[in-house]
Amino acid sequence: MNNEIKFLIDTLTKNLVLRVIKDFGLSVKEALDAVYNSQLYDKILDLETGLYYQSAGYNYQLLHKELVKGKI
């Protein structure tokens, strides 16, 4: 993974965590746990999916669905 991709993933992850904190009222630790332990995060790290390149809004829709319904 090159530095550009790592930067995109890190920035996306930060934005997802901030949205989870805002929308679900979780602490920073709880939001980090929710994002890092999600199926979506695993898919973001799988570069073949291309999710790391999609917008935070698009990825948040998937994450929100997973957190509410338990699946993507």
Segments from the language model and where they lie:
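C-terminal alpha-helical interaction appendages
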Residues: 1-72
